[in-house]
Amino acid sequence: MKILLVQIKDFENSLENEIKAFFESKNFEIKCKSFELSDAAKIPEVLLQDSVSIDYMIGVGLAGFFVLSETNSNSKIVVNPWMSPSQKLSQKETVSHDLITILKKIETQTYDWVDAEMRVATYGIFTHDANSCDKEMFLKNYGRNMNGVDNYFIEEEILTNVLEKSLEYFAHIRKQGDWQSLNLFYT
């Protein structure tokens, strides 16, 4: 199985290395793709092109948002995804108004395009310290297919357990053979 681990330069997360190690231990083929935030407008299209040759797409934090923006219904695992990066980044002086405008456009397109198949194909993992607005927005757009972790920081053993659950979830979905028949996973 092939995995694409998406990263945004200067927004990397320590969990990315642990996630990579987990999937390497399962003999998954892992490709890491790193983007500059200044290239935000191009990221969804590049990910869409890359999606044809992978089984799972994974992103943490800001990278999780861009994983959600990819419109193909690949299996997606997002950890503490930033659901509205335009709001989070609008307070930073180093982020231009033009970039905020681009992010708002991607947000609108991302959440307007969510359909039943995309809901089932998306699995979210949230830690206790994740922004509650992000959790609520994930639930609103993608349904109940998420796993909450009560810890502020995900220890390796806990991360391993929730990643195992995500793989079990997707194995169950694939076994069903019909993504759209699994409406029980969302509200």
Predicted regions located by residue number:
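Active-site catalytic motif of lipid deacylating hydrolases and related acyltransferases
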Residues: 2-51
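Conserved hydrolase catalytic core segment
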Residues: 69-75
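The alpha/beta-hydrolase serine catalytic core
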Residues: 75-187
